[in-house]
């Protein structure tokens, strides 16, 4: 997961990063409805914090928009690409997924450095010709409720401005 590896990211000053949101609009809307940040907002905050706001981030939503690159922008304009997580599954192969695989194929043929976690890895592996299979034991994601934060948890940035009891 991104949180486990973000301390190892090498982010340069004035780096141009393409942030690819892997979710469909409905999934992002669900995060917002629950009072959470969307996947792309979490990534954006981490990248800005890691770089001390010295990066230029361009956010795109290929699962939502047909024309997702801003006018006059090329994939070659970026030093790096960061691909977010998503509630999608690569083996479902719907239009949103196929568009993202096609984008990944384009990016793999360019000079960009690419970081993907969870969903981003599924897309990149598939685009590179690899196979991703469904876990026979079911979904590995876990939802936790009624969490009582320790003193360390209370001061952790992930829980900033949140209730002590989650």
What do the predicted segments below correspond to?
Residues 9-95, 99-102, 106-110:
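N-terminal beta1-alpha1 cap of cysteine-dependent amidohydrolase-like domains
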Residues 21, 61-63, 118, 136, ...:
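Residues at the C-termini of beta-strands that transition into short coil/loop
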Residues 86-90, 118, 122, 131-132, ...:
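Gly/Ser/Thr-rich beta-alpha loop segments that engage phosphate groups in nucleotides
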Residues 92-95, 126-128, 136:
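Short, conserved acidic/polar surface loops in the N-terminal third of protein domains
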Residues 108-128:
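Catalytic nucleophile loop
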Residues 129-166:
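Pocket-forming structural segment of enzyme catalytic cores
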């Amino acid at each position: 997961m991104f949180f486990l590896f973000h301390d190892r990211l090498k982010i340069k000053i004035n780096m141009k990063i393409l942030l690819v949101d892997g979710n469909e609009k409905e999934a992002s809307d669900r995060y917002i409805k629950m009072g959470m940040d969307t996947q792309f907002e979490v990534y954006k905050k981490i990248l800005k914090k890691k770089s001390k706001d010295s990066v230029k981030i361009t956010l795109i939503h290929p699962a939502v928009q047909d024309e997702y690159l801003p006018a006059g922008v090329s994939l070659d304009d970026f030093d790096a690409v960061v691909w977010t997580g998503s509630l999608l599954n690569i083996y479902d192969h719907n239009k949103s997924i196929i568009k993202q695989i096609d984008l990944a194929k384009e990016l793999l043929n360019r000079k960009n450095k690419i970081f993907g976690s969870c969903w981003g890895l599924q897309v990149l592996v598939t685009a590179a010709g690899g196979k991703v299979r469904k876990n026979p034991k079911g979904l590995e994601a876990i939802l936790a409720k009624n969490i009582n934060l320790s003193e360390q948890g209370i001061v952790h940035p992930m829980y900033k401005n949140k209730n002590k009891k989650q």
